[in-house]
Amino acid sequence: MRTRITKTLLDSWNYMFDCAEGQEDNAREEFLTTLKREQTPPNEAQQAGLDFEHLVMEIAEGRFVPEWVDQGGRCEPNSGEPMGYDKYPKNYAGAKKIAEIVQGGQWQVHVDTNLTVDGRDFWLHGFCDVVKAGVIYDVKFKTKSFGSLDLWGSYRHSSQHSAYLRCLPEADMFMYLVSDGEDLYIESYNRKNSRPIEEIIHDFMEWLKTEPELLAIYEERWAVDG
């Protein structure tokens, strides 16, 4: 039996043990929603992240056009040109910093691989935000300013870099590009400082075995056809 597995599932599982105090019930509910593969609309923070990523993409691909704000139909006295100014959206400064790094890269690259852990076959797959010159980039957006956050090592427990580096052998680096709309924080991982994804999957499956009902859901909902 072969089952699919993703960084989203693994990270939602891990979050149950790494969430803020008092959020344990919410974290478990989020994991169960992911495990059951139930579709839910993005929450406010997720939508903000999607909007920010779209802005980065538009800038990187040269498609972004600022809004022109006309100043009441007035014209320049010498040239006769309409008077006004370009209005840039909130978070543009941070998006531009990321766009300058990922410009020329491939967006939303599907990556996958088959692997075997403890005798069980898995199909590991996902989508990289950007791949460029042997580096996988993931765009992250923080709704809080960096001044109020402790950023160092924010993603060390994420399975994302471990999973995607395993899926894309020609890549040698994974970089999280994180912005609060103004500043840029970069967190980098390679294979030497990333936990093998096989170890993470092993721990996940060992935990599932302690919850037989959830293991049954996983084997049913995440089975690979054929």
Locations of regions flagged by a protein language model:
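An active-site-proximal "capping" alpha-helix that borders the catalytic cofactor pocket
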Residues: 157-168
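Short alpha-helix boundary/capping segments
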Residues: 44, 152-159
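Conserved catalytic cores of phosphodiester-cleaving nucleases, focusing on short active-site segments
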Residues: 126-148, 164
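Metal-dependent nuclease catalytic regions and adjoining charged, substrate-binding loops involved
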Residues: 9, 166-226
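Short, structured patches in soluble enzyme cores that scaffold and shape functional sites
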Residues: 111, 140-141, 178
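Coil-to-beta-strand transition motifs
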Residues: 121-125, 132-134, 169-172, 182-184
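Metal-dependent nuclease catalytic cores that hydrolyze phosphodiester bonds in DNA/RNA
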Residues: 1-128
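Hydrophobic/aromatic-lined pockets within catalytic cores
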Residues: 60-64, 141, 166-169
